[in-house]
């Protein structure tokens, strides 16, 4: 199997696990994998947009644990829908480049 296909299968599996367990509003892949330049040693940068009760950091850690063993390093960042709206045009936030250069992997039907 080609490396690109294998990477895509792993990313698809990460999305499936996140959607199944956490019901996010949206998942965006950004960084080198979204640009198509990431290798197996590059982490998959995932912006997970979801409602959170409590700590977003704790939610990101829980998601990271749910993705254990997928076979690719990853960096999970959890933001709320309100933060996306508030910071979508603010340069210097992680939301800004993720929305502009990222690839939407999942979006919950309205």
Q: Which residues are covered by each model-predicted region?
A:
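Catalytic core of pol beta-like nucleotidyltransferases
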Residues: 1-26, 35-40, 50-110
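Short beta-strand->loop micro-motif that forms the acidic, two-metal-ion catalytic signature
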Residues: 45-49
């Amino acid at each position: 199997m080609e490396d690109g296909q294998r990477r895509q299968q792993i990313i698809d599996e990460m999305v499936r696990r996140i959607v199944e367990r956490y019901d996010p509003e949206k998942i965006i892949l950004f960084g080198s994998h979204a640009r198509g330049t990431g290798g197996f040693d590059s982490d998959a940068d995932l912006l997970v947009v979801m409602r959170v009760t409590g700590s977003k950091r704790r939610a990101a850690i829980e998601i990271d644990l749910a993705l254990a063993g997928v076979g690719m390093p990853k960096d999970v960042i959890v933001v709320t829908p309100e933060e996306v709206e508030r910071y979508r045009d603010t340069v210097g936030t992680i939301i800004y480049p993720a929305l502009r250069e990222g690839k939407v992997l999942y979006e919950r039907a309205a």
